[in-house]
């Protein structure tokens, strides 16, 4: 029932915003001179990178979960703008290192992922909306890889509330391989972002994942991002689990940069 509800919601959102693509689009096209990243929030950016741009988002994360301590990096997401409202996305294999000597998740590289993102907004109500589809390939170490071809769909959105406050969120549906079966998982997020100064903002975020098998995973997430220049960004974030199935806590840092030099 939960999976059907998430699927219906995704279809409804995509169907509802698709007819609005031609309305007031210029208002929310990303400025070609300013970086706008997916990280460090769970909620992805609701806009694409500018056409001809290459953006790399990187970071390191330390996670404590059910007695296991794991670090991973470099969390590299490559985003390439192929059209004014379309980007290609490549998630490089991430290396996981289990700091515990007994049991738990093994160490090694994760799977490679390819995706595409299409900007659908802004809508008449002032919402920016995008749709993301992706597929992972079982290229990682057997101790880390799912061993399957895993797909997913995400619909991030955002809306400015005032000159300094923005609300955002994302509805997602994933089909991860666990063992020999799929554990279809719905996820929803809600984020409030506050711009402290022109280049510096902070956020608080809730993220909930709801798998068909296993308990729900509720997270409370805090973070900040500082633009060192228009095309360079540092970030820092921490999160705590609110349910027994979620990670106990995690902490991460990141650095992202934008190349704006490709012309057609």
Residue map of PLM features:
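Transmembrane beta-barrel domains of Gram-negative outer membranes and organellar outer membranes
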Residues: 23-264
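Sec/Tat signal peptide C-region and signal peptidase I cleavage site
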Residues: 18-22
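Positively charged n-region of N-terminal signal peptides that target proteins for export
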Residues: 1-5
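Bacterial N-terminal signal peptides
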Residues: 7-17
């Amino acid at each position: 029932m939960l999976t059907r509800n998430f699927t219906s919601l995704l279809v409804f959102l995509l169907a509802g915003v698709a007819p609005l693509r031609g309305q007031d689009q210029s208002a929310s096209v990303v400025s070609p001179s300013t970086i706008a990243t997916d990280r460090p929030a769970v909620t992805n950016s609701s806009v694409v990178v500018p056409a001809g741009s290459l953006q790399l988002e990187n970071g390191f994360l330390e996670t404590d979960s059910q007695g296991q301590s794991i670090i991973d990096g470099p969390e590299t997401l490559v985003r390439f703008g192929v059209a004014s409202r379309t980007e290609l996305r490549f998630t490089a294999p991430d290396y996981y290192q289990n700091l515990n000597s007994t049991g738990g998740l093994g160490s090694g590289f994760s799977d490679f992922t390819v995706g595409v993102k299409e900007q659908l907004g802004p809508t008449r109500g002032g919402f920016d909306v995008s749709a993301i589809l992706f597929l992972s390939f079982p290229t990682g170490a057997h101790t880390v890889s799912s061993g399957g071809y895993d797909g997913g769909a995400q619909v991030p959105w955002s809306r400015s509330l005032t000159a300094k406050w923005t609300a955002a969120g994302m509805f997602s549906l994933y089909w991860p391989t666990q063992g020999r079966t799929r554990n279809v998982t719905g996820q929803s997020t809600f984020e409030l972002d506050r711009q402290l100064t022109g280049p510096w903002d902070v956020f608080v975020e809730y993220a909930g994942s709801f798998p068909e098998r296993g308990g729900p995973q509720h997270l409370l997430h805090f973070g900040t991002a500082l633009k060192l220049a228009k095309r360079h960004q540092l970030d820092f974030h921490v999160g705590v689990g609110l349910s027994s199935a979620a990670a106990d806590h995690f902490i991460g840092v990141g650095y992202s940069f934008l190349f704006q030099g490709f012309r057609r």
